[in-house]
């Protein structure tokens, strides 16, 4: 059984849910899914304005449609994207990026609109402030003069530390050295936008169901968004790195999340390129047997679950233990180290995790 090609799609996934990574039994479906990526989505985008919005339903669509200065490879390393190279001043305050000459903006129809230039990144940051981007906190204290502009202490955007020295040269000036600055360039708040196009669209820029409400400089262009139905994308033939884009078409079909077996069944029938399966589902054992060599667990997330103990409790509004004797004994217990350790050791993390992630996924979901 062949494995389908999988497109890296930004978006949240639930902890340690099994993912099937095989293709259907039919050779015709194998051939189709080798060029097309098909999966599901659950939330319609509220906007396509990738600079102002930082919610998953937007980035789910635009991450593969709009490129920034740098990108992360499959190992998480930063690699050139719209910026083909960059330099850092000795004091760590000035970052200068060279914009590649073959980067282009195209419409949803794939028609070339304009080259991507350094000015587009300046326009993008100004649009982030004008639109009160949710991501401004990522860079507001980093870029020289930006915080003052945001607060209205100056109305002159030229005082902000982002400059287009020429069409191919972009410069950021920071308030203090940040060894992690380049990581921030992958954030939506620092993405580019063409000023002429932005002005022409006005308040219609980023309209959620209009593929023509934004321009594209990434590997894919959006073809359509049909609420509660589908999101479709196609390969951008004008993309600067198109030789490394192996997927021709992308289609996400709306899934309301009610029937957990719909995706796995669609995968088995060749409808989807991959499938998320649920270890707690009644059909998990069947799919685990059918696809045992092609089941992968997601990496555990960064979330932390804690239990806090109140050593100095003064109110007892939400407990039946309200007598002075009960309060005293409770306080003594909480101040006892061995008692607190006993509470910790009494929690079976594996069993707790298995309630959500099943027996197979329980241990995978726990980091420590």
Regions found by a protein language model. Give the residues of each.
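Gly/Pro-rich hinge or "lid" segments in bacterial periplasmic/extracellular proteins
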Residues: 157, 168, 174-251
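Extracytoplasmic/periplasmic ligand-capture domains
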Residues: 74, 101-110, 115-131, 221-356
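Bacterial signal peptide processing site
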Residues: 24-26
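C-terminal motif of bacterial Sec signal peptides marking the signal peptidase cleavage site
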Residues: 19-22
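Surface-exposed binding/hinge segments that line
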Residues: 120, 127-197
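N-terminal lobe/hinge region of extracytoplasmic solute-binding protein
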Residues: 40-90, 215
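Structural transition elements
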Residues: 361-368
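Bacterial Sec-dependent N-terminal signal peptides
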Residues: 1-8
